Regions:
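Class I (Rossmann-like) S-adenosyl-L-methionine-dependent methyltransferase catalytic domain
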Residues: 1-65, 75-125, 145-149, 168-229
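A short glycine-rich, Lys/Arg-flanked "PGG" loop and its adjoining helix->strand segment in the class I
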Residues: 151-163
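A short acidic, Gly/Pro-enriched loop at the edge of an enzyme's catalytic core
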Residues: 124-136
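Conserved beta-strand/loop positions that form the S-adenosyl-L-methionine
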Residues: 72
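Structural signature of beta-strand start/N-cap positions in the alpha/beta core
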Residues: 68, 89, 132-134
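A short beta-strand submotif of the Rossmann-like class I SAM-dependent methyltransferase core
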Residues: 138-141
Length: 229
């Protein structure tokens, strides 16, 4: 992707980076009283919210031993999820240098065979070669960008996947009971949330040559399993 194209999204990407850098470093957020009075805020502070809304990507991924998997926007995924039990080779890309450094310092210690490192960069500009992954995953962050940005992410995921590879991602369900309040909470934390209708994601997937193999609805997000023609 061109440098100019990256610059079009620089403000939102930087805001998202700062929001998660602070969370990973356990730095306090200076929030107004009305934000701290929200029930979702209390769940967020107790870390119960992330567990409740996280998408179970592995249930749709269909991992097989020695699959090569790229986790886009991986955070500290390799430290949280049982990648070793899945016996797949883990590659990552992340905008947060805090998360990237944490994984690269500990990932190889956990499993030097399966952990292949995390690169720093945004989702629309993957730092990997064409056609090398069996699975690509991007959960928890499509909601921070407009649909035209996600088009670029889909095209990049398609580029790095093998012909028979699949892409697993999620999008926020605007009809979820907690969607609007969650978007408000994230606004207080420094980032904008786009409540894009799910049908628009369905249409976009088709426009870029994708086929929806299956979906799964969660507390806040809908999970997609997509192949490309």
């Amino acid at each position: 992707m061109s440098e100019l194209l990256s610059d079009n999204w620089a403000t939102q990407i930087e805001a998202l980076k700062e929001r998660f850098d602070r969370e990973y470093k356990h730095e306090p957020f200076d929030l107004p009283e009305e934000a701290e009075s929200m029930p979702l805020f209390r769940e967020w502070v107790s870390h119960s919210l992330s567990a409740k809304i996280a998408s179970p990507f592995w249930e749709l991924a269909g991992f097989r031993k020695d699959h090569r998997c790229l986790d886009i926007g991986c955070g500290v995924s390799f430290l949280i999820y049982p990648w070793r039990d899945w016996s797949v080779f883990f590659y990552g890309q992340e905008i947060s240098s805090v998360a990237r450094d944490a994984l690269n310092s500990r990932g190889s210690q956990l499993n030097s065979k399966l952990y292949k490192g995390v690169k720093l960069g945004a989702a629309h500009d993957l730092k990997y070669d064409d056609g090398i992954f069996d699975r690509s995953i991007a959960t928890g962050f499509s909601c921070y960008f407009p649909l035209d940005y996600w088009r670029l992410v889909l095209l990049e995921a398609k580029r790095v996947l093998k012909p028979d590879g699949v892409f697993i991602f999620d999008s926020i369900d605007p009809a979820s009971e907690i969607a609007e309040n969650w978007a408000i909470l994230e606004m207080y934390l420094g980032v904008e949330v786009f409540l894009t209708p799910l049908q628009e994601f369905n249409n976009l997937i088709e426009e870029v040559g994708g086929k929806i193999l299956s979906t799964r609805s969660g507390e806040l997000f809908q999970l997609y399993k997509v192949s490309f023609t």
